């Protein structure tokens, strides 16, 4: 097949129009095109629409600085490809599948690569089993348990702890799960990606070899000491398109990460599929970038200025994040909530696709309770006695009822004070405040902030602890004894100590 080439005819920021000769087959929608820039680097474009007889409108995956009209453009004949295979373990890629860890690019043509735009699995291929995924985080395991192979959303405004919670989940699940993890950094801070890589190296989820670790401990970052034979034992792969990237890259990087997760899930052949964890931080930036691209392409905006295709784009991606008979993808997605408004179209569209939602609340964060999960706003599809068992379900319902009662009484307390409450209500408020504080716990990834060692709490201990508080066995202990504690034994010990000192 002869190479199809065209010329740049218009450049408006990241939107580039390419003109081809008359009679040539135009590149298909979502095909990638390449421009060789003056400095020798290659700029990748993705076709978005066909204009007139022989022009395509594209969006660039990197900055269009230095481009000029008339530059030659080559059609690749396929969508953007991501490298797959055993060599991707422990590696960092960008949106177009190039390595960004300084360890050299991997081949991604033919059987070594997969296109980032793919169909979702067929209905008959989907898995229907339900299994609980325990995280060791009390509030999540008790109130809104996560399903293995399910989709989980962490909703929260700016600075309430989404990234810390997602890093704790990576720490708890990825270490305990022993399976593979794929992390897609979508339009977030580059520093967080850097911190995460260092943390993964220290915890042994990514392996660069002993020589490199010694150089890292001494404050260096000597890539010549990386042992590539050890690297294949790594349990994670990263794909980054951070907030300094143009909108084209941020709108596609979630799909690039998902492509690698799908490859791990389905394997190269029958019976080779695996259980994969897919972390996305932050899915809102995917929507935000889609809105920027939509505006740049001249589409009429929809509600609150979002793209008219918001639900379609979100659905096309979310339907691919699913579990099949070959393997499962359990995805954890952080969702930024603009101005703490859960009815904003971006978070509201995401809600429809999830099995469990963890809503982080600024009011709870202000009380110093971390993780700042709102137990009354958070939901789970699998919170049912036939899946979790009677004890777990009834304990979760009692906790919710108690906290709901406390919420209703707060207006009365604010106006009239505690004295005006009946004895029964006073007791309920005291227990609710203890329950609220006991829902907090110290995190491994936040040790440097809290000075407390992180804990994983078994679900049996969690249920026992909350039942003791609600049954009134611990009414004599001060409320502050329950804050940032793991098990109920720790809280009792701290409470007895406080009483002795008083």
Swiss-Prot record:
Enzyme Commission code(s) on record: 7.1.2.2
Recorded GO CC terms: plasma membrane; proton-transporting ATP synthase complex
Subcellular compartments: Cell membrane
Keywords noted in UniProt: ATP synthesis, ATP-binding, Cell membrane, CF(1), Hydrogen ion transport, Ion transport, Membrane, Nucleotide-binding, Translocase, Transport
Keyword Secreted assigned: no
Transmembrane helix in keyword set: no
Membrane-protein topology: Peripheral membrane protein
Top EC class of this enzyme: translocase
Pfam family, one: ATP-synt_VA_C
Single GO molecular function: ATP hydrolysis activity
UniProt-annotated binding residues for ATP: 156-163
SMART domains the UniProt entry points to: AAA
Catalytic activity as recorded in UniProt: ATP + H2O + 4 H(+)(in) = ADP + phosphate + 5 H(+)(out)
Subunit structure: F-type ATPases have 2 components, CF(1) - the catalytic core - and CF(0) - the membrane proton channel. CF(1) has five subunits: alpha(3), beta(3), gamma(1), delta(1), epsilon(1). CF(0) has three main subunits: a(1), b(2) and c(9-12). The alpha and beta chains form an alternating ring which encloses part of the gamma chain. CF(1) is attached to CF(0) by a central stalk formed by the gamma and epsilon chains, while a peripheral stalk is formed by the delta and b chains.
Its biological purpose: Produces ATP from ADP in the presence of a proton gradient across the membrane. The catalytic sites are hosted primarily by the beta subunits.
Family: Belongs to the ATPase alpha/beta chains family.
Protein name: ATP synthase subunit beta
